[in-house]
Amino acid sequence: NCKGEKIAERKPAISFRVYWDGDLQDEILNGTNLSKWNGTEALTINKFPGAMHCNGTKRTPNLSADLFGDWREEIIFSDTEDPSKLRIYTTTIPTQNRLYTLMHDPVYRLGIAWQNVGYNQPPHLGFYIGDGTEDIPWPQLYMPHGQYSKE
């Protein structure tokens, strides 16, 4: 904790972080297993059968990104039977949290690029979202033929 006191006996294995289940905390993606840390243990949310991770011991997805635009991220793996095919996984868990697509954040967009051209690490935001977040910064967009609003 902030006082330097140990808060748990164990810690989860973490390869990637992913926004998946609809709360404002990220989940843990380790290989093809997605889990949620509850402070004591990692609880499995989803396993992706037929999916193949890459990068040997790091066991990363091909890409994780907010591709479809509701702010939660999709995960892309190769197919175990035919690695020339891709599998795109998206969440079906409902959420009450409404945010704009993460791709509107320039730091996040840069993170998607670095996954593809360099060291395969998960993307991060240029602002904080997590438990207790109430005010998400509104993206600075330029609309050449119109205006936009939060509504």
Q: What kind of feature is each model-predicted range?
A:
Residues 1-151:
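Beta-propeller-forming repeat regions
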